[in-house]
Amino acid sequence: MAVDLLLGLQWGDEGKGKIVDVLTSKYDIIARFQGGPNAGHTLEFDGQKHVLHTIPSGIFHDDSINLVGNGVVIDPVIFKRELDNLAKHKIDYKSKLVISRKAHLILPTHRLLDAASEASKGKAKIGSTLKGIGPTYMDKTGRNGLRVGDLELEDWKDRYRALADKHEKMIAFYDVDVQYDLKELEKEFCTAVDTLKELTFIDSEEYLHQAMKSGKSILAEGAQGSLLDIDFGTYPFVTSSNTTAAGACTGLGVAPREIGEAFGIFKAYTTRVGSGPFPTELFDEVGERMGKVGNEFGATTGRKRRCGWLDLVALKYAVQVNGITQLIMMKGDVLSGFDTLKVCTAYKYKGKEITHLPFNIESGNIEPVYTEVKGWEEDLTKMTDASSLPKEFNEYVDFLEKELETPITIVSVGPDRKQTITR
């Protein structure tokens, strides 16, 4: 069987965790293919809220295997905290969680390097989550990294020491004030590694190949969003991995011909955490209202998200680079009560009106061109089927479908897995 993809189409925080949780019953394997603990997937069900950072969102379902792919970077300390939380909720994770031997490990010194690098940039900071993601991927591409499979070797601590010593020299080079107790951090790290070694390590590309041969259904779960992709995002305000569809192939060892459906997920408006360009950002009471009603705070950092109207220019771009076959719209309920909604359908750029994402969309270079759409008053959170949705809401969705030339097959009207409507 083919591998289906679930990809965020904006700057992350689209609601992928909830939708993976909703879709999981259709799949035998849920696989994460990139990113690390800089991502946060929030799931709500049975009156409880759960946040996952590295573990795939299918872990709460009994019949699915959850795979952490080679493209993921793992912080054993944060991973252990996730496992401890699952154990507290009596989730039997050991029987349904497998980890690629080729996944790279985030060391304590990676996090310190991240902090030192960000501090050295002054006003040019890019808004790093300070989780050590960038330095870990740098070691990966620089062929210096420590991988999960190395933990099975007798000399893994020697390999760790050599890399950590190199990092300490680099931290000193930045000449910034970063306070830390490395011995204490390493003690915590080694304890977490012991927990990690209790799990099943696999050669994930072979595992997935055999799964496909035997007819298993697989969903590849992306982290963050397409506009944060290292190549196709709003560089340099991006993450350190490929968050787009192609990243699933390299992050899991899956051939392009094996890709099936590509589900693209987006909010009915736009948000962004941290620094970087955001053409439709709102600085008025409308943006404040979106943030308050939508509870827009980062699941990983707790930072307040910037809010704005839906940007169809950027969204079309994301649909294009990912080859999206079906769209999923989240948080339609947040827009209830607005008389009029605005949607950015073009940019004014260098004196011209354009409908594509240019190389540089930094503030001042781009002016959004808006199309107005009639809003709706009804509270969507109590609605359970498509026939009950208000006319104006359906007109909004129809307008987006036409502009994006892609069907919107699912809409979310609340955080709980039950607040999901198939169209």
Swiss-Prot record:
Record protein name field: Adenylosuccinate synthetase
HAMAP family, per the entry: Adenylosucc_synth
GO CC terms of this entry: cytoplasm
Places the protein is found: Cytoplasm
Pathway listed: Purine metabolism; AMP biosynthesis via de novo pathway; AMP from IMP: step 1/2
EC number: 6.3.4.4
Chief location bin: cytoplasm
Binding site for IMP: 13-16, 38-41, 129, 143, 224, 239, 303
The reaction(s) this protein catalyses: IMP + L-aspartate + GTP = N(6)-(1,2-dicarboxyethyl)-AMP + GDP + phosphate + 2 H(+)
Catalytic residues, chain numbering: 13, 41
Lineage: Bacteria, Pseudomonadati, Bacteroidota, Flavobacteriia, Flavobacteriales
Binding residue positions for substrate: 299-305
Pfam family, one: Adenylsucc_synt
Cofactor (UniProt): Mg(2+)
Presence of keyword Magnesium: yes
UniProt GO BP: 'de novo' AMP biosynthetic process; IMP metabolic process
Family as reported in the entry's similarity comment: Belongs to the adenylosuccinate synthetase family.
Job description of the protein: Plays an important role in the de novo pathway of purine nucleotide biosynthesis. Catalyzes the first committed step in the biosynthesis of AMP from IMP.
InterPro entries membership: Adenylosuccin_syn_GTP-bd (IPR018220), Adenylosuccin_syn_Lys_AS (IPR033128), Adenylosuccinate_synth_dom1 (IPR042109), Adenylosuccinate_synth_dom2 (IPR042110), Adenylosuccinate_synth_dom3 (IPR042111), Adenylosuccinate_synthetase (IPR001114), P-loop_NTPase (IPR027417)
Binding site for GTP: 12-18, 40-42, 305, 331-333, 412-414
Cofactor: record remark: Binds 1 Mg(2+) ion per subunit.
Binding site for Mg(2+): 13, 40
Subunit (UniProt): Homodimer.
Organism: Christiangramia forsetii (strain DSM 17595 / CGMCC 1.15422 / KT0803) (Gramella forsetii)
Gene name per UniProt: purA
